[in-house]
Structure formats: structure tokens, C-alpha cells
Amino acid sequence: RLSKKPGKVKE
């Protein structure tokens, strides 16, 4: 799963 916020990229 890609978050719009940087550093909050979780699958």
C-alpha cells in the first residue's frame, strides 16, 4: 500500500 505521505509507505 502506498501512502501519500513520504516515509509512510506500507505494503
From Swiss-Prot:
Keyword Nucleus listed: yes
UniProt keyword annotation of Mitochondrion present: no
Highest taxon listed in the record's lineage: Eukaryota
Key words of the record: Chromosome, DNA-binding, Nucleus
UniProt main location, coarse: nucleus
Family statement: Belongs to the histone H1/H5 family.
Role description: Histones H1 are necessary for the condensation of nucleosome chains into higher-order structures.
Protein's name according to its UniProt entry: Histone H1.A2
